[in-house]
Amino acid sequence: MWPFPSRSLFPPPTQAWLQTVSSDPEAQGWGAWNETKEILGPEGGEGKEEKEEEEDAEEDQDGDAGFLLSLLEQENLAECPLPDQELEAIKMKVCAMEQAEGTPRPPGVQQQAEEEEGTAAGQLLSPETVGCPLSGTPEEKVEADHRSVYVGNVDYGGSAEELEAHFSRCGEVHRVTILCDKFSGHPKGYAYIEFATKGSVQAAVELDQSLFRGRVIKVLPKRTNFPGISSTDRGGLRGHPGSRGAPFPHSGLQGRPRLRPQGQNRARGKFSPWFSPY
């Protein structure tokens, strides 16, 4: 047990102390003093002013925090629009596309748009083209090939106008085409000259080995490419024994086993000269 009684350590409050505490708020603690400070005598005014200043400071801080919060909310709304707004924008775009597809264009406008698309596609394949466009039918293309020449070893900096001026002495030039790479757009180093008449082709061939921009050019009649027929000589003529994929002609020796003479190349262990691995 505790050797000292509780009353000796914590004596009960006296009547005088209770009266003093009830009359003096400072004796009741800081909480009671803050509540009753403003009703005191001359010192109460100063406490009230301090309290008002603290309240004003807190209001200013709250106002600043609210202003910053409103700015952040506006930025978030600007950066991330509402899902409903995005959905409405997508719907409007889809409706506009459907109306554009469903509304028929006038014949003149549609024909002009198709011509512009065809011109753009032709410029991608041959951007350096001067003269009339290429005819559409196969017969007209073959006839145009007979009036054209191939020009090789053309300087990369040469233009279609310069080639037209170089071959203008041979006759009227109908069209000049400089072939370019479809990926890089750089010239390939050769061109085609189409004349108005076939007689100009022979005169243009005479300009073979002539100088164009300091380079010796090669001029040949243009070959006509037929679909399904190759004009190149790859692997020899078809049907020839040396051509690729052509069978050997039948002979009396075909189908018979190839015999090796006895006693030859057995000691060395090499293949017989009669053996063909392929």
Swiss-Prot record:
Q: In which tissues is it expressed?
A: Expressed in various adult tissues.
Cross-referenced Gene3D superfamilies, in alphabetical order?
3.30.70.330
- Which cellular component, as a GO term, is one annotated location? nucleus
GO BP, sorted A to Z:
maternal-to-zygotic transition of gene expression; negative regulation of protein ubiquitination; negative regulation of SCF-dependent proteasomal ubiquitin-dependent catabolic process; nuclear-transcribed mRNA catabolic process, deadenylation-dependent decay
Which SMART domains does the annotation name? Answer: RRM
A Pfam cross-reference name: RRM_1
GO MF term (any one): poly(A) binding
Places the protein is found: Cytoplasm
PROSITE patterns in the cross-refs: RRM (PS50102)
Question: Which stretches of sequence are listed as region Disordered?
Answer: 21-66, 101-128, 227-278
Keyword Lipid metabolism assigned: no
Which InterPro entries does the entry link to? Answer: Nucleotide-bd_a/b_plait_sf, RBD_domain_sf, RRM_dom
Q: Where is the composition biased (Basic and acidic residues)?
A: 35-50
Please list the residue ranges annotated as the RRM domain. 147-224
Which keywords label this protein? Cytoplasm, RNA-binding
**Acidic residues bias: where?**
51-63
What is known about what this protein does? Binds the poly(A) tail of mRNA.
Name by which UniProt lists this protein: Embryonic polyadenylate-binding protein 2
Give the species this sequence originates from: Homo sapiens (Human)
